[in-house]
Amino acid sequence: MIRIYTQLEQGEAWLRRYSDRLPLFTCILGFTETGLIPGISAAGRTPEDRKYTACADAEFLYYGAEHQPQYPLPPLTAGASPVLISRAVVEAFNMPVYLFNAGLPQSPAIPAIDLGGCPAKCLSTGAAMELTTVEHLFKQGLLWGERLAAEVPEGYVILSECVVGGTTTALAMLTGLGINAAGKVNSSHPVCNHEQKWQLVQQGLEAGKEAGGQGVGCRGDKSPIDPLKLVAAVGDPMQVVVAGMAIAASRGCGVMLAGGTQMLAVYALASAIAETYNLSWQPTAVVVATTRWVAEDSTGGTVELALNIGKNSQYPQIMTPPLLATKLSFANSQYPQLQAYEQGFVKEGVGAGAACIAANLYKNWQQHQLLQAIENQIQRLLDR
């Protein structure tokens, strides 16, 4: 049920080490005004819907299908929110869940830990966040990473995200760090909107340079980059929090970065921050976990992107992380909302792929058990 796409030996060793452990499941919620641009994301049918996607997903993850939500799951162009997958696993194993508000336009209707961040402006401005906010969020990430690791000293933490428009800020982060990512990221669309993303990223990196953002460069620049300034220019609040959490948690437990493009960007960011600020961490304790819909998306290039992280002239010591994916399939699902995943809609989010990998590691769940649990979630939602 698990395929390793890069760093086979390291990935296998990681899976063996944590094969029977129940992880902590965390989701870091953030927002970028990039997500409001028409056509940028399918994680909510309209820009107005997308303002509330993170709140809705968090509420469903925490309370489940029977709860009458303050923020209902938003209508999608096709498919259903990947939180259905994550919730199915979290509920089945009574997995501890921690939710963090890194910067949302409104407070979620759940007991989330507020990290004192704020939503990011559109990355095209080159001034997405104040540097002081980024530094504060990074410190919060370090603090909570250490706390979470202390809860599972022999286990691992799943660090997941919910940020609409987050694959575009991921492209900006990777490009700014000198990694060849153009045309290789994923999206919630069946065919990735590479051109739209790339134009925004070029605009943002250029604007960041013109505004005097020292260390905000485009691929090909040889000067080293201050990664925190790069986040302030073109990032989103989730990225720097999870980078901090991963660095600190890796010192004491395993870390599963739960997502595709977005978590490859976070891994690269964490590596760059650790080098720039001389912070100790254990990159071999970290894996990136996603779905096969991301890893095998023919309109992206996730595996190539993971490999490119290890071919970076600006940060030559950054290694390619192990990229894992669940083999979960919805081809035989009776629900068209789930079959849509096989047509390329949605693909990943809220740690869906990582949750399935965790279920297989912990209790050897296979395709039929996962599908049954997920279909049970969708039926209860329809019955509500």
Swiss-Prot record:
One Gene Ontology molecular-function label: nicotinate-nucleotide-dimethylbenzimidazole phosphoribosyltransferase activity
InterPro entries: Nict_dMeBzImd_PRibTrfase, Nict_dMeBzImd_PRibTrfase_arc, Nict_dMeBzImd_PRibTrfase_sf
Family in the record: Belongs to the UPF0284 family.
Matches recorded under NCBIfam families: nicotinate mononucleotide-dependent phosphoribosyltransferase CobT (TIGR00303), PRK04447.1-6 (NF003373)
HAMAP family assigned to the protein according to its UniProt record, in alphabetical order: UPF0284
Protein name: UPF0284 protein alr0297
The organism of origin for this protein: Nostoc sp. (strain PCC 7120 / SAG 25.82 / UTEX 2576)
Lineage of source species: Bacteria, Bacillati, Cyanobacteriota, Cyanophyceae, Nostocales
